[in-house]
Amino acid sequence: MDGRNRRKGLEWHFDLAMSMRGVGWNWQVKNIPQVTPKTKWQFVRTQLSKAFLFYFLFDFIWYNIQGSIYATPSPPPLLSDTVPRQILWTWIPGLESYYSFNMQFPLFSALMVGLGFYEPEDWPPIMGRLRDVDCVRDFWGKFWHQGLRKVCVPLLKLH
Protein backbone atom coordinates (compact mmCIF):
# COMPACT_ATOMS: atom_id res chain seq x y z
CA MET A 1 0.00 0.00 0.00
CA ASP A 2 1.53 3.32 -1.01
CA GLY A 3 1.48 6.46 1.13
CA ARG A 4 -1.46 8.06 -0.67
CA ASN A 5 -3.72 5.01 -0.19
CA ARG A 6 -2.65 4.70 3.43
CA ARG A 7 -3.50 8.36 4.07
CA LYS A 8 -6.87 7.93 2.31
CA GLY A 9 -7.56 4.85 4.43
CA LEU A 10 -6.76 6.74 7.64
CA GLU A 11 -9.02 9.62 6.56
CA TRP A 12 -11.81 7.15 5.79
CA HIS A 13 -11.35 5.42 9.16
CA PHE A 14 -11.35 8.74 11.05
CA ASP A 15 -14.47 9.92 9.23
CA LEU A 16 -16.29 6.68 9.98
CA ALA A 17 -15.23 6.66 13.64
CA MET A 18 -16.33 10.27 14.20
CA SER A 19 -19.70 10.03 12.44
CA MET A 20 -22.24 9.51 15.22
CA ARG A 21 -25.17 9.86 12.80
CA GLY A 22 -23.62 8.17 9.77
CA VAL A 23 -24.09 11.19 7.50
CA GLY A 24 -23.22 10.09 3.97
CA TRP A 25 -22.73 6.44 4.98
CA ASN A 26 -24.96 3.44 4.24
CA TRP A 27 -26.05 3.35 7.90
CA GLN A 28 -27.16 7.00 8.21
CA VAL A 29 -29.87 7.47 10.85
CA LYS A 30 -33.36 8.59 9.84
CA ASN A 31 -34.85 12.08 9.90
CA ILE A 32 -31.69 14.09 9.26
CA PRO A 33 -33.01 17.20 7.51
CA GLN A 34 -32.21 17.83 3.88
CA VAL A 35 -30.46 21.15 3.45
CA THR A 36 -30.25 23.40 0.43
CA PRO A 37 -26.79 23.31 -1.12
CA LYS A 38 -24.54 26.24 -0.27
CA THR A 39 -21.14 27.26 -1.42
CA LYS A 40 -18.27 26.69 0.98
CA TRP A 41 -18.09 30.31 2.11
CA GLN A 42 -21.87 30.78 2.35
CA PHE A 43 -21.91 27.76 4.65
CA VAL A 44 -19.01 29.08 6.75
CA ARG A 45 -20.68 32.50 7.13
CA THR A 46 -24.02 30.94 8.06
CA GLN A 47 -22.44 28.59 10.60
CA LEU A 48 -20.37 31.36 12.20
CA SER A 49 -23.53 33.51 12.46
CA LYS A 50 -25.32 30.62 14.18
CA ALA A 51 -22.39 30.08 16.55
CA PHE A 52 -22.40 33.77 17.47
CA LEU A 53 -26.17 33.80 18.02
CA PHE A 54 -26.06 30.68 20.20
CA TYR A 55 -23.10 32.10 22.14
CA PHE A 56 -25.04 35.30 22.80
CA LEU A 57 -28.13 33.36 23.96
CA PHE A 58 -26.01 31.01 26.10
CA ASP A 59 -24.20 33.96 27.68
CA PHE A 60 -27.47 35.77 28.36
CA ILE A 61 -28.98 32.76 30.11
CA TRP A 62 -25.78 31.89 31.98
CA TYR A 63 -25.54 35.38 33.50
CA ASN A 64 -29.20 35.28 34.48
CA ILE A 65 -28.65 31.96 36.22
CA GLN A 66 -25.57 33.26 38.04
CA GLY A 67 -27.47 36.31 39.24
CA SER A 68 -30.49 34.39 40.44
CA ILE A 69 -31.41 33.32 43.92
CA TYR A 70 -31.16 29.72 42.71
CA ALA A 71 -27.39 30.07 42.20
CA THR A 72 -26.74 30.75 45.89
CA PRO A 73 -25.23 28.16 48.25
CA SER A 74 -28.65 27.53 49.81
CA PRO A 75 -31.34 28.21 47.20
CA PRO A 76 -35.01 28.22 48.21
CA PRO A 77 -37.22 25.32 47.14
CA LEU A 78 -38.40 25.77 43.57
CA LEU A 79 -42.00 25.11 44.61
CA SER A 80 -41.93 28.18 46.88
CA ASP A 81 -41.84 30.39 43.77
CA THR A 82 -44.80 31.38 41.59
CA VAL A 83 -45.91 28.87 38.94
CA PRO A 84 -44.73 31.00 35.98
CA ARG A 85 -41.29 31.38 37.59
CA GLN A 86 -41.20 27.64 38.35
CA ILE A 87 -41.83 26.93 34.67
CA LEU A 88 -39.21 29.49 33.63
CA TRP A 89 -36.57 28.11 36.02
CA THR A 90 -37.34 24.58 34.90
CA TRP A 91 -36.69 25.47 31.25
CA ILE A 92 -33.64 27.70 31.73
CA PRO A 93 -31.06 24.93 32.46
CA GLY A 94 -32.32 22.99 29.43
CA LEU A 95 -32.01 26.06 27.22
CA GLU A 96 -28.51 26.67 28.56
CA SER A 97 -27.49 23.14 27.53
CA TYR A 98 -29.22 23.50 24.15
CA TYR A 99 -27.46 26.77 23.37
CA SER A 100 -24.12 25.45 24.59
CA PHE A 101 -24.32 22.39 22.36
CA ASN A 102 -25.60 24.35 19.37
CA MET A 103 -22.84 26.92 19.77
CA GLN A 104 -20.09 24.31 19.38
CA PHE A 105 -21.43 22.35 16.39
CA PRO A 106 -21.66 25.25 13.89
CA LEU A 107 -18.29 26.59 15.02
CA PHE A 108 -16.58 23.25 14.44
CA SER A 109 -18.41 22.65 11.15
CA ALA A 110 -17.38 26.10 9.87
CA LEU A 111 -13.78 25.33 10.79
CA MET A 112 -13.76 21.91 9.11
CA VAL A 113 -15.43 23.16 5.91
CA GLY A 114 -13.39 26.37 5.87
CA LEU A 115 -10.14 24.39 6.10
CA GLY A 116 -11.32 22.11 3.28
CA PHE A 117 -11.53 18.86 5.26
CA TYR A 118 -15.27 18.44 4.57
CA GLU A 119 -18.00 19.73 2.27
CA PRO A 120 -21.05 21.68 3.54
CA GLU A 121 -23.38 18.71 2.83
CA ASP A 122 -21.36 16.63 5.31
CA TRP A 123 -22.67 18.86 8.12
CA PRO A 124 -26.50 18.85 8.22
CA PRO A 125 -28.00 20.56 11.28
CA ILE A 126 -27.30 18.73 14.52
CA MET A 127 -30.88 19.22 15.69
CA GLY A 128 -34.23 19.37 13.94
CA ARG A 129 -37.14 21.70 14.54
CA LEU A 130 -38.93 21.65 17.89
CA ARG A 131 -42.26 22.11 16.12
CA ASP A 132 -41.86 18.55 14.73
CA VAL A 133 -41.82 17.11 18.26
CA ASP A 134 -45.06 15.68 19.64
CA CYS A 135 -43.71 13.03 22.02
CA VAL A 136 -40.51 11.69 23.56
CA ARG A 137 -39.95 9.40 20.57
CA ASP A 138 -40.09 12.40 18.22
CA PHE A 139 -37.66 14.30 20.45
CA TRP A 140 -35.01 11.61 19.99
CA GLY A 141 -35.94 10.63 16.43
CA LYS A 142 -36.78 13.94 14.72
CA PHE A 143 -35.24 16.66 16.87
CA TRP A 144 -32.07 14.92 18.04
CA HIS A 145 -31.79 12.64 14.94
CA GLN A 146 -30.89 9.58 17.00
CA GLY A 147 -27.50 11.16 17.64
CA LEU A 148 -26.51 8.88 20.48
CA ARG A 149 -28.17 5.67 19.34
CA LYS A 150 -25.31 4.27 17.26
CA VAL A 151 -22.86 5.09 20.04
CA CYS A 152 -24.81 3.86 23.08
CA VAL A 153 -26.76 0.82 21.83
CA PRO A 154 -23.66 -1.37 21.31
CA LEU A 155 -22.59 -0.57 24.87
CA LEU A 156 -25.98 -1.67 26.20
CA LYS A 157 -25.66 -5.03 24.43
CA LEU A 158 -22.54 -5.99 26.38
CA HIS A 159 -23.02 -9.07 28.53
Question: Language-model segments: what does each one mean?
Answer:
Residues 1-119:
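Fungal eukaryote-biased detector of long internal structured cores
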